[in-house]
Amino acid sequence: MLFRSERLGHDLRAALEASGQPVQVLDTRRLGPGPIGRGLGRALFLLRLAWASRRCRLLLSLHAGLLRSVEPLLPRRLPRLAWLHGVEVWGSALPPVAASLRRCRGLAASSGYTRQRLLAEPGPWPPVQVIHPPAALWPDGTAPAPLPPGLRLLTVARLAASERYKGHDLLIDALANLGDGDWHWQVVGDGDDRPRLQQRVLAAGLGDRVTFSGAVDDDALRQAYQRCNLLAMPSLCHERPDGSWTGEGFGIAYLEAAVAGRAALACRQGGQTDLVQHGLTGWLVDPTAIAVAAALREALADPGSLARRGAAARQRALQHFGRDRFTAAVAAWLEGQG
């Protein structure tokens, strides 16, 4: 069994080992700095793949583009599977990898949204099974911390200029018009777009109500979830001029918040809708500052709604998105591949 080692790869490896499956992990990590280190790492990966693919019974790729690039090295009769995360198979990203995906014995998708998008495209496609990733951040049995008073918002995402879809700008515009009230926004994550966002916060007069925490380790991230009472991440799902898409393939931060007993504010379209249910576990809104501000005002006016929706989010997360369920789903999916 082979797959690319990423965060999901570690969860998959644990699930497979728990079910008694022998696993070999291959990845493309660098072997030194710069282009030379990257090239050496890729060359070693390809050599290991060429050797190992002739000694395994099944190959699982965690990236459609990677599968396409290595297919010439694979034995023709080697059954292969692929995991679909989201944007890498939406819109103009799909045609270059479509043939490789059609040659797979089976596909797994991190959300029903991504599965539906793929099946809406001309096929035929292999069977596509939805398997939601688990929230590895929280040790099993961790009890949720009490909710803080007021409105304590948290956003967890990279601050990359190339990924301005996570909703930071929407939140700044919404908060600028929220008015008085007991609220604060913590922004976790770092990247080259941070200076621009900080300047926007200052220009909107929100400097004393917004904290940029930068990149944090897991302990600090758990504390951030415990200090908030609403995960605010209205990620935009939209098509770029070149035909590529932005949006959440699943959105692990929504699940991490739910396990912590925190409700979420999200947009209506994207993989996060598998988890966030409007009026039950959070708010699903249109991608406008007006809609985001309206949801925030509702949360401020009715603090009990944060507790109710947070408790419902935790219950749903533990029942339908837990690690045991993930392990069982992976085992059942692989067993069905023959």
Where are these regions (language model features)?
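Donor nucleotide-sugar binding/catalytic pocket of nucleotide-sugar-dependent glycosyltransferases
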Residues: 103-141
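Conserved donor-binding/catalytic core segment of Leloir-type glycosyltransferases
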Residues: 145-166, 172-175
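Short hydrophobic beta-strand element within catalytic cores of glycosyltransferases
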Residues: 254-259, 263-266
